[in-house]
Amino acid sequence: MTDKAKDVRNVLFIMADQLRFDYLSCAGHPHLHTPNIDALAARGVRFDEAYVQSPVCGSSRMSFYTGRYCRSTGAVWNNIPLRVDELTLGDYLKELDMRTVLVGKTHMAPNTEAMERLGIEASSGIGVHVSQCGFEPYERDDGLHPTERPAYKNLAYNKYLEKQGYEGDNLWHEWANSAMGEDDEILSGWLLAHADKPARIADEDSETPYMTRRAMEFIAEADAKGERWCCHLSYIKPHWPYIVPAPYHNMYGKDELLPVVRHEVERQSPHPVYGAFMEQRASTAFAKDHVREHVLPAYMGLIKQLDDQIGELMKFLEEQGRLDDTMIVFTSDHGDYMGDHWMGEKDMFHQPSVKVPMIVFDPRASADATRGTVENRMIEAIDLVPTFIEACGGTVRTHVVEGRSLEPLLAGEKDVDWREAVFSEYDYGHQWMRQKLGRHSGETGMTMIFDGRYKFVHCEGYRPILHDLQEDPQEFFDRGDDPEYASVIQRMEGLLLEWALTRNNRVTKSDAAIDAYEDKKQQLGAGVAIGFWDEKELEEARREAGFIIE
């Protein structure tokens, strides 16, 4: 391991998409064995209480990349752009002479309106920087390329498949995400009925191995140039379409799934927002046992394939000599209900959706005491940005970054004044359920606060949702209108208000600059004399401030 006094040289920031916290063997899954991810956990720390700032791809990732809550970035759902002046991980690491690149997905939407107003060309260096969330797009691929979106024609992955001899119009769909029928017809992976079939593509040419190789190519290139780097390897899977190539498509069966977590009481007079979400198509599909039993084995196969590729990646890093100086993080942008709580997809705030896997390997000797341990203190996605900055030798701009560095926890410090709660946000304004509920956009926000026992969700225009995870760890019973919990609700509302009023919105002037400001001296030095009665009083003040030296 590296010397304690040294900084981390590189960062490998691995993110899966839609990976549940409990579908890893190191997290207790009895049938889905993930030895390579487990091995990474054995080298580092597995954070067992890690929460995302939003249980949906785009807004979660914007918080991961900025170190800021959704209400600070304004990105409260998919395809809501960041402000062009929003600082990201790439900005902070650039100051440390690190090359920060993307391989895979960000779900970042460029702020084209602001760029046009400011005269920023999209193809310029600054244009690419602000359009790609501060990353250098070594290969940007958000992983969803239906034929109805013509951008697939210029997709680098499709061009790769062409070179491998695959034929068709949209190779991403026709080969990587479709199966073959008995009459040689293409069976689309968009359709859940085909999840049990193998994708047409060879395993080595499918998306997860392809992205792994692309990350290796970048690392080898950067190492050859002697560059410090941060590589964000952002996998597309196990996000839908739920289809995986052989041999992973039939490795698991319905008897190897985790038991579904749901209760009939959840469908009896549910909270209006949760009730509406239960009626969305993905929820009604996965509420059916046969759908869940048919699709989840493919989801598990995608995870197994991912674990195998993590193994290939770790072997490569060892061969490159990078395991001694590279911080490695493995996480996910959110989870997946898969029928739990009568829901599909993610979006809401139960544990399968908002809680994620989080493993951090710190190569320095300062982290030796915590290797192979499980940390139960609550952390948030926004904690990674300050962790990376500090580990790489930088100073966190605390007036901008809202996360907390994990370095004290990685070093095994016990007396750390840590957070009392975690927060997550969601806006269903873009969803069908908004119309069903008769809500206008702008009044569809939801904010969760969880203190380790009570999970409180504020829902605009409705009563709150409250779960007591000590008495009800599976979150079946909503106590949001229970008089016995009135004092708890009042306390949680107070904590939420306090949090909402203390966001970092003054980002253009640092705390240090304000602390250094001496009001009287600054005003007198600028010739401003407010409130003085006569020349004598002014002269005394100027002498005290050091402007008159005798």
Regions found by a protein language model. Give the residues of each.
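Formylglycine-dependent sulfatase
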Residues: 1-459, 464, 473-494, 526-550
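Residues forming the ATP-binding cleft of Hanks-type serine/threonine protein kinase domains
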Residues: 470
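A contiguous, mid-protein "functional segment" used to position or interact
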Residues: 483-522
